[in-house]
């Protein structure tokens, strides 16, 4: 009782992925507005490539927390990389973020290590 089980994924499990980005302080309201009307073709592409339960959370200081569930994170990223709508979306989003070091926002998403999960 009270012991934690190690984290593992079964063959059919969805992987929970969380990442952090930083939105520029002067772009916070514009970032919020653009996400009120994400392009339908972008939403369709995300769904087609296994992005499920995808959420973004934005703190007032610009910290953006992204969360998504997918069976295969690498395949989900690769699938979106081949979508023309994603190239357009990433180009449109690029100037909203700090510290991208010359890459698109989707290339700067580095998954955090999950250390606990209560199902």
Where on the chain are the PLM-derived regions?
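N-terminal amphipathic/basic-hydrophobic helices that include classical n-h-c signal peptides
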Residues: 1-13
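A general secondary-structure signal for short beta-strands and their flanking turns/coil
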Residues: 14-16, 61
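Active-site-flanking beta-strand signature of metal-NTP-handling nucleotidyl enzymes
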Residues: 16-22
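Short amphipathic alpha-helical segments
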Residues: 27-52
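Short, glycine- and small/hydrophobic-rich beta-strand elements in well-ordered beta-sheets
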Residues: 43-65, 69-71
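An amphipathic, aromatic/His-enriched active-site/gating alpha helix that lines ligand/cofactor pockets
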Residues: 49, 70-108
């Amino acid at each position: 009782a009270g012991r934690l089980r190690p984290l593992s994924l079964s063959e059919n499990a969805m992987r929970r992925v969380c990442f952090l980005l930083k939105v520029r302080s002067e772009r916070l309201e514009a970032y919020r507005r653009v996400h009120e009307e994400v392009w339908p073709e972008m939403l369709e592409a995300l769904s087609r490539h296994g992005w499920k339960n995808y959420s973004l959370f934005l703190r007032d200081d610009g910290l953006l927390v992204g969360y998504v569930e997918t069976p295969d994170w690498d395949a989900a990223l690769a699938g979106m990389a081949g979508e023309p709508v994603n190239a357009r979306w990433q180009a449109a989003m690029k100037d909203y973020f700090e510290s991208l070091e010359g890459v698109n926002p989707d290339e700067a998403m580095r998954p955090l290590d999950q250390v606990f999960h209560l199902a």
